[in-house]
């Protein structure tokens, strides 16, 4: 599977005492694609998304979930930085050839 980043940092969202807390996790090589669009509606606000394809070999015991945060590089911060983006959807493609198995993430 084609990858273009050596890894990324995932922050698993958990709730502790009614407040969100995060568990830092590192993922191996991923394919990271930023998509920038201009909305054609009246507000003209840009719609920016990031598509991340994570090979099954890069997943280390945890599959990303909706509302987790993700950063496009390996960082050592224990809490997500302001540049972290929120995962909006996760699709798993864990069938077929092992070299083609992957997880697709859309984040904003």
Question: Model-found features: residue ranges?
Answer:
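Short, conserved turn/kink motifs that form compact alpha/beta structural patches or helix kinks used as
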Residues: 20-108
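Active-site-proximal polar cores
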Residues: 1-26
């Amino acid at each position: 599977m084609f990858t273009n980043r050596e890894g990324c940092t995932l922050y698993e969202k958990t709730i502790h005492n009614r407040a969100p807390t995060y568990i830092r996790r590192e993922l191996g090589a991923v394919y990271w694609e930023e998509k920038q669009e201009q909305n054609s509606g009246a507000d003209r606000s840009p719609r920016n998304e990031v598509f991340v394809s994570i090979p099954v070999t890069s997943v280390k015991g945890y599959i990303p979930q909706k509302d987790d945060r993700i950063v496009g590089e390996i960082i050592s911060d224990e809490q997500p930085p302001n540049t972290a983006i929120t995962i909006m959807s996760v699709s798993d493609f864990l069938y077929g050839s092992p070299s083609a198995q992957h997880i697709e993430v859309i984040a904003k």
